[in-house]
Amino acid sequence: MDPYKVIIRPVVTEKAISLIEKENKLTFIVDRRATKQDIKRAVEEIFNVKVEKVNTLITPRGEKKAYVKLKPEYSASEVAARLGLF
């Protein structure tokens, strides 16, 4: 699956910003057909970072949300700044 089709948009909520600052996690809405491996590959390729783990859930609205934890040597704040979240 094309990395640019896997990630639909970042989530910008109070909880998502808190996760960026406290747990080094990014939150994205992703394609519902994307697997955790697809999401990991897409984030690593697009943002040039290494991913530690990916957790996913289907929201009540029917969207797939992915919580992506980056390895400690990479900063979620820097990626968020590149995305324009800060």
Swiss-Prot record:
Pfam families in alphabetical order: Ribosomal_L23
PROSITE patterns for this protein: RIBOSOMAL_L23 (PS00050)
Native organism: Pyrococcus furiosus (strain ATCC 43587 / DSM 3638 / JCM 8422 / Vc1)
Gene Ontology biological process terms from the UniProt entry: translation
Assembly mode: Part of the 50S ribosomal subunit. Contacts protein L29.
Annotated disulfide bonds: none
Single GO MF annotation: structural constituent of ribosome
NCBIfam families the UniProt entry points to: PRK14548.1, uL23_arch
Job description of the protein: Binds to 23S rRNA. One of the proteins that surrounds the polypeptide exit tunnel on the outside of the ribosome.
Name of the featured protein: Large ribosomal subunit protein uL23
Signal peptide: none
Domain of life (superkingdom): Archaea
Keywords assigned: Ribonucleoprotein, Ribosomal protein, RNA-binding, rRNA-binding
InterPro entries xrefs: Nucleotide-bd_a/b_plait_sf (IPR012677), Ribosomal_uL23 (IPR019985), Ribosomal_uL23-like (IPR013025), Ribosomal_uL23/eL15/eS24_sf (IPR012678), Ribosomal_uL23_CS (IPR001014)
GO cellular component terms given for this protein: ribonucleoprotein complex; ribosome
Recorded family membership: Belongs to the universal ribosomal protein uL23 family.
